[in-house]
From Swiss-Prot:
Induction: By heat shock and primary alcohols. Acts as a chaperone. Belongs to the heat shock protein 70 family. Coiled coil: none annotated. It comes from the Bacteria. Signal peptide: none annotated. This is Chaperone protein DnaK. Keywords: ATP-binding, Chaperone, Nucleotide-binding, Stress response. GO terms for molecular function: ATP binding.
Length: 25
């Protein structure tokens, strides 16, 4: 999964990305 460092992203977004990454992997 690609993590984009944008001020607009919130902690929840990071968690969602991590969860999605686990699902894909």
């Amino acid at each position: 999964a690609k993590i984009i460092g944008i001020d607009g992203l919130t902690t929840n977004s990071w968690v969602a990305v991590l969860e999605s990454d686990k699902v894909h992997v």
